Amino acid sequence: DNVLAYDKDEYCGFIFTTNGFLNLFRLMKSVYQKRNYIVHNKDLPIYFIAGENDPVIINKKAWLKSQEFLKSCGYQNITSTLYSHMKHEILNETDKEKVYQDILNFCK
């Protein structure tokens, strides 16, 4: 059902432009530079969630490195959940209720 809805959505499935890639690469470069961070609330709750089979996180080591980067910037209240047997769209996976419950618990 999700795939069908995606295929029918006029805003999905478009061809990413050269400018789109350029801006994405600029964003990725700047997001991992400490000088771009000003921590106003070191206790801000940050919740990292991902599926263990998500190619975007590369691997668990790289995923943990992202969290360590934010800690090195000064954030101290970082928690995370890596969902086994899930891919990129964890909110559309078979066990999505677990993910939603974890997000709800984090927000309480």
Description of each model-found segment:
Residues 46-47, 52-79:
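Conserved loop-alpha-helix segment in the C-terminal half of the alpha/beta-hydrolase fold
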Residues 73-108:
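Catalytic active-site module of serine/aspartate enzymes centered on a nucleophile-bearing elbow/loop
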Residues 1-38, 42-49:
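Alpha/beta-hydrolase
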